Curated annotation (Swiss-Prot):
Subcellular location: Cytoplasm
Function: Involved in the regulation of the intracellular balance of NAD and NADP, and is a key enzyme in the biosynthesis of NADP. Catalyzes specifically the phosphorylation on 2'-hydroxyl of the adenosine moiety of NAD to yield NADP.
GO molecular function: ATP binding; metal ion binding; NAD binding; NAD+ kinase activity
Catalytic activities: NAD(+) + ATP = ADP + NADP(+) + H(+)
Family: Belongs to the NAD kinase family.
Protein name (record): NAD kinase
Signal peptide per UniProt: none
Originating gene: nadK
Active site, UniProt feature: 45 (proton acceptor)
Organism ancestry: Bacteria, Pseudomonadati, Pseudomonadota, Gammaproteobacteria, Lysobacterales
Length: 258
């Protein structure tokens, strides 16, 4: 007989998530992350992203249950907790590779971060951002004027990217979305779909008069002068989903939401 998986239950600070964790720990035990087989994250998408950033290097599959305001990356939480082991056994994996971001700031400092949804550059003041865009070392947009620009993964393409009129990308398509944010010039440019291995470089053309910040998921860095982005070849995380509502189907269905 196969032993049940050891589950590490993580919860957001929200009261419903904390209460659910207490019940689940009482039912299934409390296993430390380093000796667990599966991570169960209780909260919303923000907490899921936090979990991936903090524990993605552990290579433990993550099964999320929605106990927050937004739950695109989560499964539904069910009051019948006894069916959790069956759900985990039937769950389908979705493999995500984050974006790797490297930043140079106006002060000369360097920084880096990962993003599972998107990396977005935004103007810091009332002045529009002036940016250049290089792809694989070739300048494609010499000067983009607008509120900013972003690079989104397929998993993140239904979030901020879609709100900025970017394309929804199928999971497993090995593509990225390059999407301008409120572009003024060139006005007709609406972005591009890139191969996942494309090296993207943004340069801020007037960082003193028109300062720009960059955010990788929730990690913000201000006063940047250059940002390089590419998909990670080293890091991959596994999310688990109920087969009747897997991530691939959710992304596909978003294209027909009205």
């Amino acid at each position: 007989m196969t032993a049940p998986p050891r589950i590490a239950f993580l919860a957001s600070p929200a009261e419903p998530a904390v209460a659910a964790r207490a019940r689940l720990v009482q039912r299934f035990g409390d296993h430390a992350l380093d000796c667990a087989d599966i991570v169960c994250a209780l909260g919303g998408d923000g907490f899921m992203l936090q979990t991936l950033h903090r524990h993605g290097a552990s290579n433990k599959p993550v099964f999320g249950m929605k106990l927050g305001s937004v739950g695109f990356l989560m499964n539904q939480y069910r009051d019948d907790e006894d069916d959790l082991l069956e759900r985990l056994q039937r769950a389908e994996p979705a493999y995500l590779r984050p974006l790797e971001m490297q930043v140079q700031t106006e002060s000369g400092a360097s920084a880096g971060s990962l993003a599972y949804n998107e990396v977005s550059l935004l103007r810091q003041t009332r002045q529009a951002a002036h940016l250049s865009i290089d792809l694989n070392g070739q300048t494609r947009i010499a000067e983009l004027i607008g509120d900013g620009v972003m690079v989104a993964t397929p998993a993140g393409s239904t979030a901020y990217n879609y709100s900025a009129h970017g394309p929804i990308l199928p999971l497993g398509s090995h593509t990225l979305a390059l999407t301008p944010i409120a572009p003024y010039r060139p006005r007709r440019w609406r972005g591009a779909i890139l191969k996942a291995d494309t090296a993207v470089r943004f340069r801020v053309l007037d960082p003193y008069k028109r300062p720009v910040s960059v955010t990788a998921d929730s990690h913000e860095i201000r006063d940047v002068v250059e940002v390089t982005i590419r998909e990670s070849t080293q890091r991959q995380v596994t999310l688990l989903f109920d087969p009747e509502h897997n991530l691939e189907e959710r992304i596909f269905s978003e294209q027909f939401a009205v």
